Amino acid sequence: MSDSLLVTVLLKHDQSKNLEDIQRHMKQQDWWERFPPQGVELVSWTVAMGLGQIVTLRLPPSLLPALNVELERSAWGVFSTEVFPTYDFIPVRETIRERVRN
C-alpha cells in the first residue's frame, strides 16, 4: 500500500459574490498561507473557466482530516467544494497500450 494518496479538490466559486468579495474572504481566512495544509504537496492547480479551480494534492492518509478541516475553515463561504480520490492513469494507460499491441 502506498504511503500517500492523490486527492482532487474542485473549488466552485460562489457566483453570488464578486471577485473582490471572494478575495477579501480569502485574505481574512489567510487562505494563501493555510491551503494546502502543511505536509500536503500541491501537485497541480488549474482553472477551468465556467467550472472553477481544480486542485490536485498528494498527502499521507493521516492528513486527510486536516485537509477536510482546512477546506471547511477557509474555503466555505466563497467556494462550494467537491473532493475526489484520484490516481495517475498514465501507467495504467501504458500497460493497456502494450497489452492491446500484442
Predicted regions and their residues:
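Conserved short beta-strand edge segments in small beta-sheet-based binding/regulatory domains
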Residues: 75-88
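A short linear boundary/processing microfeature
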Residues: 70-74
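Short S/T/G/P-rich N-terminal loop/turn motif that feeds into the first structured element of a domain
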Residues: 1-36, 41-52, 59-65, 69, ...
